[in-house]
Amino acid sequence: VGFKMISIIINFILLLPVIIFLANADIAKNKGKVHLYGIYGFFGLPGRGKTMCMSKYLNDMRRKYGNKIYIMTNYHYKDQDFEFTTWKQLLEDYDKPLVVAWDEVQNEFNSRDFKSFPIALLTQLTQVRKGNGIQILYTAQRWHFVDKNFRSLSFGCYDCGTWFGRYTFARMYDPLDYDEKCNQVHGDKRMKIHAKRSMSFIQTDKLRNCYDSYKMLRTAKSKEYMSRQEIAMTERIL
């Protein structure tokens, strides 16, 4: 193993001028281009601020990139470009980077629309660095409520919390670390699992009014959902 590693290092040193030249060419080619990718989850029981954290993230992205990106949500975010109504929209080609915000994803995965969820979509989700890029955000009450195939594609997991109804914070974990944290019953061992980064903010009235969760609830009520037997069958197929 040591000899193979030495060989890799020697080849790297010999090829370094070419690598630097090509890397600089990539930087020049992509200068000023917005490219977003990754799948990130926001988790927390009702009232802990998971949808608020996701909305704050969207506000920050819109403030940073303006109209250079598209935003698509299923919970009537006021600054969205499109309404997210079916997974088929993820397979379309977009002329700008797309940020998808998927609130209460476990409910969507149990809808009849998801019954025809194709393997092609999983392939698409793993290739989100291609083209203009797709970044997918989602919320769920618990990590294990989310479809296991979708969990395996996640880049990061935000564990959300809110104090006094106004101060909201979230710690982002590596998915493998977060899975261990969720499965760990001993508090001292849970404390040893460290977050990669964090975010915190005050829930202003403006932020609270940037989406309409009640309208989303009405939309959810109009959907047809699979039975437990159908869900189990779908999971076996995937």
Across the structure, where does each feature detected by a protein language model lie?
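Conserved P-loop NTPase motor module
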Residues: 156, 169-238
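The conserved Walker
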Residues: 46
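Walker B catalytic acidic pair
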Residues: 103-104
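Conserved lysine of the Walker
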Residues: 50
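Hydrophobic positions on the alpha1 helix immediately C-terminal to the Walker A/P-loop
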Residues: 53
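Hydrophobic anchor at the beta1->P-loop junction of P-loop NTPases
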Residues: 42
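Pre-Walker A adenine-sensing motif
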Residues: 19-33
